Each structure stands twice: as C-alpha cells, then as structure tokens.
C-alpha cells in the first residue's frame, strides 16, 4: 500500500486539539498536517501489519515539485508565491508524469521497502529519479502515530481489530 505524502510534511504538525481545523482553518497548515498524517499512517500501518501478521507492505512517496495546478489554484494563487513559482519553476520542478515516478517506484519496485519513503533524488528532493526520501522526526513519532490511528478509526468508524493474519 502506498500513501501519497509531500515535502510539506516537513513543516507539518498534528494538532490533536483541532485535528479537523474546525476552530482555526489555514489552508497551508491543514495541507502540511494532512501530508504528515499520511506519512505517519503509512509507517503505523506497517508497524501494525508486522505485529498482527497481516503480510502487507506499507510505504509512502512524494512527487517532489511536480508541475501541476496546485500553486496556481491553491491558497495565495497569483500572490507572491505564485510569481516566484512562475520565475523559478522551469529550473526546480519536473513534469507531473515525472512526479508520479516515486509513487510507481514505491508500488512496483522490488527495491521498495516496508516503511520506506520515496521521492525525487535531486536538490532538496524537488526533482529527479526516485530514491529514498528523508523522513522528518515528527513523522517517526510512534506514540503520536498510534494516537492518530485511534482517532482516525473513531472518526471514520473503521477498525482493523478483526483483520486476520495472512495465511
């Protein structure tokens, strides 16, 4: 199973007191939190699979800086970030198809590892061929990941408690 994260996980934090941003919604903060949560989910899913004998492989990937419409249509579109983006984009980004390669690597490569995280191998992981990516310390917090798992199960009504071990 591959979870799609982002370089934005690096500045993310899980706000357990306002997990769904109902008291204070800031788009970039919510995006960073969601991408951190996706990476934490991937790592926690692998821990739980290992412990329960589910026999699945969970990892994550990020596209680097792929040329999509995220910045053009997201918060602050046509602001300073958008103008800087337009200026430097040709030098620091890659096509959307190239951005998909780390996800394909994580899903199909025999070199992909459980609890692995993959992204572009270039400058600041912005572009380049797929390679192991840096996982920030907050994503490795097993206690926070377990708490997030439990809260997610409660909010969604989905539980994995009855999933049998792989035969």
Where are these regions (language model features)?
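Rossmann-fold NAD(P)H-dependent dehydrogenase/reductase core
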Residues: 1-78, 155-166
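Short, exposed beta-strand "edge-strand" segments with a Pro/Gly-rich flavor and a Y/T-containing core
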Residues: 11-15, 134-140
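Short glycine/proline- and charge-enriched loop/turn segments
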Residues: 17-25, 78-86, 127-135
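Glycine-rich loops and low-complexity Gly/Arg-rich segments
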Residues: 25-29, 40-42, 83-87, 141-145
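C-terminal helical subdomain
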Residues: 34, 85-133, 140-146, 150
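C-terminal amphipathic/interface module of NAD(P)-dependent oxidoreductases
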Residues: 136-167
């Amino acid at each position: 199973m591959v979870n799609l994260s982002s370089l934005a996980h690096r500045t993310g934090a899980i706000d357990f007191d306002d997990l769904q941003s109902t008291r204070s919604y800031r788009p970039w903060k919510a995006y960073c939190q969601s991408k951190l949560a996706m990476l934490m989910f991937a790592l926690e899913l692998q821990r739980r699979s290992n412990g329960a004998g589910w026999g699945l492989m969970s990892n994550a990937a990020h596209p680097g800086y792929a040329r999509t419409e995220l910045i053009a249509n997201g918060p602050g579109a046509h602001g300073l970030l958008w103008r800087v983006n337009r200026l430097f984009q040709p030098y620091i980004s890659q096509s959307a198809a190239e951005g998909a390669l780390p996800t394909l690597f994580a899903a199909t490569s025999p070199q992909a590892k459980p609890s692995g995280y993959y992204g572009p191998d270039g400058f600041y992981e912005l572009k380049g061929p797929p390679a192991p990516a840096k996982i920030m310390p907050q994503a490795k917090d097993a206690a926070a990941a377990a708490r997030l798992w439990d809260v997610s199960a409660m909010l969604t009504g989905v539980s994995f408690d009855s999933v049998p071990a792989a035969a």
